[in-house]
Curated annotation (Swiss-Prot):
Highest taxon in the source lineage: Eukaryota
UniProt signal peptide: none
Annotated site residue numbers, Substrate specificity for galactose: P422
InterPro entries per record: Diacylglyc_glucosyltr_N (IPR009695), Glyco_trans_28_C (IPR007235), Glycosyltransf_28_UgtP (IPR050519)
UniProt function note: Involved in the synthesis of the major structural component of photosynthetic membranes. The 1,2-diacylglycerol substrate preference is 18:2/18:2 > 18:0/18:1 > 18:1/18:1 > 18:1/16:0 > 16:0/18:2 > 18:3/18:3 > 16:0/18:1 > 16:0/16:0 > 18:0/18:0.
Presequence extent in this chain: 1-98
Listed name of the protein: Monogalactosyldiacylglycerol synthase, chloroplastic
EC category name: transferase
Length: 522
């Protein structure tokens, strides 16, 4: 005997709403004027939580005398009701994840029992058993995975076998098509700037992204729940802005928020999307005071917010080997000042043009000798690496592909040229490298540019010739400016951020265990 789906009237309301709205838009002149001469939709007149006071009367009057207006008001009313069901309380489908008769998730409705994969009690984790950490990320850019791997490495270094750490791409691995195409969609959007800007800023208002998550949850809740539960986590860490809302709704629906520590590690230094913040998190780790202010504005309490810095791989905390030793190991000149040119993991950006400009600017024709040298990281772009390697340079140039010990490359150089990725900026500051930013992704990276400039850490320059000229001056008459920026970078660096995060997480999970054991004893 098969069990009917637990997702009943609520999803059907939402699914009924979508075609209604679509048909209405297609069959009505929403963008034109109605019989009263008023535009039915204006940029600031419709708020799903209520109409703006200034424009409410025009909007209501324009709709009240037509069949289309009546239909639209009814549809908006249905939409508001559905969104309240999804945003103000837990949908029925999340209280029981909708398993068929032959399936079992191992957890009874009262929260007791074990999950079938690991047979470890949910609400009575034994102190002797390894605690489990699940890190949620997505390969939309390299920074999220880098932060996830940094946290995993820090857990291993600090606690050894006390913790088992798992990293999963929640959307790619635990959602159905088309939701599992998120990384591919992101890569397409960021290559088409206007599309990405429209997507980023268009989903920033709370009413938009809350309704998006509510609608999306209907289709992915079952798969995401299975993906979360199979790891039996004591701690869930989100390092991605799209990993808070749906998982938290599922955990709340299962009554697991009191048993599992759910935290967010924001990986944007300044500008960040509002979806990073959710009031139900145990902790939100912010990389800067700017981000902490955004978290407070989003409604998080001071006790939920910690400003520790951006987590970077633990290898950056270790003592730096002498520059000449690192340069010798990398095949560089041991005495000439060096600039590091990076294009990210995919070797994107105007790397070739910038490298050629540096090759000319760092050569003194009068003396017939170089005034500096260049280290280029091409990432996975083998074609670019081959092309740069074939050039007959007038200065010492080392071309590398994808490197795993970027801390050694940074330690061998005196300044860096890169796009405004937060992870690279944080790592460069730890190594005391003045930064020249040559590009950024609209939205999340836009705030990193003023962050670098206003803190006296570097400059933003687009032109390869201007970049080369600045580096040449830093290695010559403006060496003092380079030194000041290096000191500022070290002053703003937070090399121990990842260790502070994992120790705070350890304390949080121990508090949970103590409370559960005390409750059982009582």
């Amino acid at each position: 005997m098969s069990h009917p789906s637990t997702v009943t009237s609520e999803p059907s309301n939402l699914l009924d709403f979508v075609p209604k709205l679509g048909n209405f838009v297609l069959n009505s002149s929403l963008h034109g004027n109605n019989s009263n001469g008023y535009s039915s939709f204006s940029s600031n007149s419709v708020h799903f939580g209520g109409l703006a006071t200034q424009n409410r009367y025009k909007f209501v009057n324009s709709l009240s005398f037509s069949k289309e207006g009546s239909n639209l008001k009814r549809i908006l009313s249905d939409f508001n009701r559905v969104i309240r069901l999804h945003c103000d309380r837990i949908p029925l489908g999340f209280s029981s994840i909708g398993l068929n008769s032959g399936e079992s998730n191992g957890v009874s409705d009262n929260g007791h029992g074990v999950l079938e994969d690991v047979r470890v009690p949910v609400n009575a984790v034994e102190p002797e058993s390894p605690k489990r950490v699940l890190i949620l990320m997505s390969d939309t850019g390299g920074g999220h995975r880098a932060s996830a791997e940094a946290i995993k490495a820090a857990f291993n270094e600090e606690f050894g076998d006390d913790y088992q750490v798992f990293v999963t791409d929640l959307w790619s691995e635990h959602t159905p098509w088309p939701f599992n195409q998120l990384p591919r969609s992101y890569n397409f959007l960021v290559k088409h700037g206007p599309l990405w800007k429209m997507m980023y800023y268009g989903t920033s208002p709370r009413v938009i992204h809350q309704s998006n998550f509510a609608a999306t949850s209907v289709f992915i809740a079952r798969e995401v729940a299975r993906g979360l539960m199979k790891y039996q986590p004591d701690i869930i860490i989100s390092v991605h802005p799209l990993m808070q809302h749906v998982p938290l709704r599922i955990l709340r629906g299962r009554g697991l928020l009191e048993k599992i520590v759910f935290t967010t590690v924001v990986t944007d230094l300044s500008t960040c999307h509002p979806t990073w913040f959710h009031k139900l998190v145990t902790r939100c780790y912010c990389p800067s005071n700017e981000v902490a202010k955004r978290a407070t504005k989003a409604g998080l309490q001071p006790s939920q917010i910690k400003v520790y810095g951006l987590p970077v791989r633990p290898s950056f905390v270790r003592s730096v080997r002498p520059k000449n030793e690192l340069r010798k190991e990398l095949g560089m000149d041991e005495h000439l000042p060096a600039v590091l040119l990076m294009g990210g993991g995919e070797g994107m950006g105007p790397i070739e043009a910038t490298a050629r400009a540096l090759g000319n600017a760092l050569y003194d024709a009068n003396l017939g000798e170089p005034t500096g040298q260049l280290l280029v990281i091409c990432g996975r772009n083998k074609k670019l690496a081959g092309k740069l390697s074939s050039i007959d340079w007038k200065i010492p140039v080392q071309v590398k592909g994808f490197v795993t010990k970027i801390e050694e490359c940074m330690g061998a150089c005196d300044c860096i040229i890169t796009k405004a990725g937060p992870g690279t900026i944080a790592e460069a500051m730890i190594r005391g490298l003045p930064i020249i930013l040559n590009d950024y992704i609209a939205g999340q990276e836009a705030g990193n540019v003023p962050y670098v400039i206003e803190n006296g850490i570097g400059k933003y320059l687009k032109s390869p010739k201007e970049i080369a000229k600045t580096v040449s001056q830093w290695f010559g008459p403006k060496a003092n400016e380079l030194q000041i920026m290096s000191q500022n970078a070290l002053k703003h660096a937070r090399p121990d951020a990842v260790f502070k995060i994992v120790h705070d997480l350890d304390e949080l999970v121990r508090q949970k265990i103590f409370v559960r054991q005390y409750s059982c004893a009582a």
